[in-house]
Regions:
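Short intrinsically disordered coil segments
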Residues: 68-71, 120-129, 265-268
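Active-site neighborhood of thiol-dependent amide/isopeptide-bond enzymes
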Residues: 156, 160-162, 169-249, 256, ...
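Acidic low-complexity segments
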Residues: 82-85, 103-178, 182-196
């Protein structure tokens, strides 16, 4: 990427560059928690020219608000940007072969509050921005075995929310968490259904929910993010301090009654495995019902981008961007393997307002 490309990106995002701590918005009032997330990046071992992309928190309105984004010791060719398709917020940086300092820190301050399903009221229209989440992507086809599986699940059910719940229950009942999967998984749902291997992690299980929902005519999407604090529900559903390995993908579907509705079948399966509980355990039954329409916001959402091109472009599209990603020549550094990519992501709670 050329210097002029970064200059153009910088000029296109002046409002983001003004969000320094002294000028940032105040934390919103009312049951909100404020977190500071810091990426610590060290690419000193990489030689030659290279590029880095970091996913940043998204401003999601009633349950998540970005207060500030700042960085230090970054190269001159660094900017806040977003992809042109999903508008996923990104920090991008480029090093030339002459750059010797390849360490940087990027800090985001973000406020969150627990998300519940909105009360039914009026009719929520499927706008073009919503309708795009009915479409297939490279790793999420909605024809063939995905379509036939969805049709079996929702057979005889016409109400959209009931269809969404039927798919949620099917995913919870038929998948399982596989701890050996790298990172959060790839979300190749066609492969999962064709092989009958429905084991995986959050990007597999929740992507399966999203793909089946789309195939059943329900707009749905993943939200990629990271856990940033301990959970009030189960120990396995929280992480604080060093959250470099605390990434987690969630899901949501669009309801004519409620708008976007939060769901998380993958966390039900995570609790079953890591808390050593059966699906029939009363605590799991309660969690299962709760996570259809609820997100505990000890987690920060990053983006809903799927099978997309980074901005500026990388060598190839990515299935998703939930972790840091870098390219130096033919070397690809994937944050799903932090042992091969010298980065840390830390979280610190700043305030809690009620």
């Amino acid at each position: 990427m050329m210097r002029r490309d970064f200059m153009r990106l910088t000029a296109a995002t002046p409002f983001l560059f003004s969000m320094t701590p002294s000028r940032a918005a105040s934390p919103p009032a009312g049951e909100w928690r404020t977190f500071e997330l810091v990426y610590h990046i060290d690419l000193a071992a990489q030689k030659g020219a290279g590029q880095l992309w970091l996913p940043l928190p998204v401003d999601a309105g009633d349950y998540q608000r970005v207060i500030s984004v700042t960085w230090k010791t970054a190269p001159e060719q660094a900017a806040l940007t977003w992809d042109t398709d999903y508008r996923a917020p990104l920090f991008a940086a480029e090093w030339t072969p002459a750059h010797t300092d390849r360490q940087l820190a990027v800090t985001t301050v973000v406020a969150t509050r627990n998300r519940n399903r909105s009360p039914a009221g009026g009719v929520h229209v499927v706008t073009p921005d919503v309708a795009r989440y009915l479409e297939p992507t490279t790793n999420m086809p909605i024809d063939g075995i995905v379509e036939t599986t969805a049709a079996k699940i929702v057979h005889g059910i016409t109400d959209p929310d009931a269809r969404a719940k039927a798919i949620y229950d099917w995913v919870v009942d038929n998948t399982f968490r596989k701890p050996t999967v790298r990172g959060c998984g790839l979300g190749n749902i066609k492969f999962m259904l064709e092989t009958g291997d429905l084991g995986g992690k959050c990007a597999d299980i929740n992507s399966l929910y999203v793909g089946l929902a789309r195939a059943a005519g329900l707009p749905a999407r993943e939200m990629y993010g990271v856990r940033v604090a301990d959970s009030a529900l189960f120990n396995s559903l929280g992480r604080a301090g060093d959250v470099s390995k605390a990434h987690h993908c969630r899901a949501e579907y669009f309801s004519p009654r409620h708008g976007w509705v939060a769901v998380d079948p993958a966390d039900v399966r995570k609790v079953v495995l890591e808390e050593k509980l059966a699906l029939s355990d009363p605590r799991v039954i309660a969690l299962r019902e709760r996570l259809f329409g609820y997100w505990e916001m000890n987690w920060v959402g990053l983006n809903t981008a799927r099978d997309f091109d980074l901005a500026p472009p990388a060598s190839a599209p990515l299935p998703y961007l939930m972790y840091p990603y870098a390219e130096f020549g033919d070397i690809r550094l994937d944050g799903r393997e932090p042992e091969h990519f010298d980065f840390r992501l830390t979280s610190r709670e700043l305030t809690r307002q009620t």
